[in-house]
């Protein structure tokens, strides 16, 4: 069910769609990357330290030390012809494709441009809004921060707006079907294992999310079966997506492995880490891998630079023979049809 708030009587008006994604810097220049890092990392749902400590850490240490290396990575995925990053371009392409189905569709980013506030100011009056976060799984550092920021901006700028928010679609039949269809053609080539790599999160985010949402402590040994925390448990939701993809593809358990990527810092994140498994697989006679990233609906820095490029290099240097990256759903026609189904429920 979608989270609904109705504040006017115009319930019959056709909904305007707002696609929410995480965002990218304005360019790969260091100053733009630094501005993006400051905005992203000072979010209390990303780094959960007290405000002043978080500001000092990010602006005084993390951004000054990371902006150069981050800018170099962003340059590898920058498209000079469109002067944009893949995440932005693909999200806008999704919006254009959905608009062809007869809906009015807008795009906003949690960090960077187009900003939620700017988009809300352009919405037509007297229409209801459906907010579609392009995050299949619930995490405080992705789905939650994007949705709560959007709600805050709606309260501030258009408090009488009627809107609803689409819930995470990690187990939605249409999402699983299009993921499986996206992967299936690659199974015709010989492979040892299909790897499903999800964006990682700090382990303590599981506890913080369940305490905040449900006033519960995240139970030990959870996540393999549904329990009261399932609606806000990122790890459970990724496990569920993996199981459903495996079933849809007709693969045995030993043919599919789930990992987590993009860890930063020294705290404990969800395991197993992709970066460690890339070197280990060849030693385990897993030398031909297919790898997909189901937590990203659009190709982005993390899928292209971290996995398809850097990940392949690590795997090959460790003795891997064949590394096949499976692109994200992006704006494919089947994905647009799946989004229509998700929106209409």
UniProtKB/Swiss-Prot annotation:
Claim: Plastid is one of the keywords in the record: no
Signal sequence extent: none
Name of the featured protein: Ferrochelatase
NCBIfam families for the chain: hemH (TIGR00109)
The keyword Metal-binding is assigned to this record: yes
Record-linked HAMAP family: Ferrochelatase
Catalytic activity: heme b + 2 H(+) = protoporphyrin IX + Fe(2+)
Reported function: Catalyzes the ferrous insertion into protoporphyrin IX.
Residues that coordinate or bind Fe cation: 199, 302
Gene behind this protein: hemH
Gene Ontology molecular-function annotations: ferrochelatase activity; metal ion binding
GO biological process: heme biosynthetic process
Enzyme kind, highest EC tier: lyase
Pathway(s) this gene product operates in, as recorded in its UniProt entry: Porphyrin-containing compound metabolism; protoheme biosynthesis; protoheme from protoporphyrin-IX: step 1/1
Family to which this protein belongs: Belongs to the ferrochelatase family.
């Amino acid at each position: 069910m979608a989270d609904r708030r109705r504040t006017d009587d115009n319930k019959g008006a056709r909904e305007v769609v707002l696609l929410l994604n995480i965002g990218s810097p304005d360019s790969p220049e260091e100053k733009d990357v630094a501005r993006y890092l400051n905005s992203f990392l000072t979010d209390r749902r990303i780094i959960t330290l007290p405000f002043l400590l978080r500001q000092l850490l990010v602006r005084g240490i993390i951004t000054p030390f990371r902006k150069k290396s981050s800018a170099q990575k962003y340059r590898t995925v920058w498209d000079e012809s469109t002067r944009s990053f893949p995440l932005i371009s693909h999200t806008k392409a999704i919006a254009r494709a959905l608009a062809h189905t007869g809906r009015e569709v807008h795009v906003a980013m949690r960090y960077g441009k187009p900003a939620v506030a700017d988009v809300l100011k352009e919405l037509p009056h007297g229409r209801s809004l459906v907010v579609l976060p392009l995050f299949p799984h619930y995490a405080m550092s992705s789905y939650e921060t994007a949705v709560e920021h959007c709600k805050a901006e709606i309260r501030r700028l258009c408090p009488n707006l009627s809107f609803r928010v689409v819930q995470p679609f990690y187990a939605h039949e249409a999402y699983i079907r299009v993921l499986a269809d996206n992967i299936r053609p690659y199974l015709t080539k010989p492979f040892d294992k299909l790897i499903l790599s999800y964006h990682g999160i700090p382990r303590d985010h599981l506890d913080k999310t369940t305490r905040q949402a449900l006033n519960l402590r995240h139970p030990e040994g959870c996540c393999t079966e549904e329990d009261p925390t399932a609606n806000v448990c990122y790890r459970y939701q990724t496990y569920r997506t993996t199981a459903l993809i495996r079933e849809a593809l007709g693969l045995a358990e030993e043919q599919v492995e789930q990992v987590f990527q993009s860890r930063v810092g020294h705290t404990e994140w969800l395991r197993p880490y992709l970066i460690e498994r890339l070197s280990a697989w060849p030693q385990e006679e897993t030398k031909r891998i297919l790898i997909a990233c189901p937590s990203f609906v659009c190709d982005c820095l993390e899928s292209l630079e971290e996995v398809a490029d850097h990940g392949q290099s690590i795997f090959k240097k460790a003795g891997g023979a064949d590394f096949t990256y499976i692109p994200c759903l992006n704006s494919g026609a089947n994905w647009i049809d799946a989004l229509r189904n998700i929106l209409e429920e």
